Amino acid sequence: MKLTHRPLAFLVMGFVWVLLACLIGLALFLGMTAGRPYGQVFRSLHVHGALIGGVMQIIAGLLLAGREHRTSQPTIFMALNLGTLGLLIGQAHGHFPLMSLAAIVLIGAFVPLRGDLVRQIRHSIVGAPMNYWFYGIALVSLAGGLLAGAAVPLRLMPYNLVGQGRLVHIHLLTQGFVVLMIVGAMHTQFPAFFNGRLHSPILGQLTFALLPLGFVVLLAGFLLTNLWVQIAGGVLMLIGALCYSYNIVRTWQDAGRPRKPASDLCLIATLFLVIAITCGILVSVNVLEGQPFVPFGSLHLAAYTHLTFIGFMLLSLLGALTDLLPNLLAEDRTTSNKKRGPYEAALTGIIGRWSTVQLWTLSIGTMSLAVVAALVWQYPLNAWPVKAAALAGALLLLTGLVVFATKLVQLLIEDPDQPSAS
């Protein structure tokens, strides 16, 4: 199949980046539990490959898919992928000029998307002024996160603030931009799975008010190194996440509790968002007295952060891809409306295969990271329960990713001119 630089190419390439980054991440996780941790370079490749090449490229594809006329965008596509590649090569070799150039290219890649972001604001199911506040924080976080990431290799940040700068950089991009964009989009997209309506616009307004407010307070806590301010921000975000989760679940119930692969993924993702924010609050509470109540090391940090990265972000985006890919493929490959309907139905059947296996392997695999971290409190790192749980979790996550990747390949090779076997 020939892929142009339309939204479909962004979505497919974004998942390829996510898959590669996840394979690196699984190797890092198993190495950590085996007592043979890999270096900082591999961790950086994993994080930036997944976040920028993967998640943010998928978000760019989803924004472009919302255009009335889905034209080819080779400049944005090349900037995102070459920028990500340049950033990773620069990090691997410690080449600061290349990293700086890549960061500037990545910033430039999102400039042409400003109109799509504005359209997202205007079409939000939650009206003004909350939609302007919500998406305004998301846009500022995107710009701030990319600029903060560029400031370190450009040496524009004082050396004693580099640690805080990296913390702000990652939180601006993940929680300030990605989490807010997904939550905002789901208020419109999730009801569309069932051709229904959002259960409560009032709860939507509360979510749009509290999530970004909590994030701003949390960010202030990081900058001030004040744990109480961080906890206050986390509590505000948790209340916003609870409003969001309740609204999503009730929307599903109002539609008659249908079982659809896309909605199932997004429902479980809302649960992980609540769990992740709760764990974040507990992380701060754990060190309120200076000495932590329970030990908290790099393995615990990895388990906690991936409740958000895999449990919320990845599952939500896979849900969106499950719903959108058959439509985009049918539109790109067929010119006849008569042929498009049956072809899209065949593609929907393909993407729905093994959906239960995919959902539960990814969900239980994500929770297994937390189980491994908890086991370390009771057993040494080289004990068999820790190793067995780590291996089982890695295999579950790998299985879920391979299932989706296999279905994606089947979608891409499905011929609209041949009768489908599904």
Residue ranges and their predicted role:
Residues 1-422:
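Hydrophobic alpha-helical transmembrane segments of multi-pass integral membrane proteins
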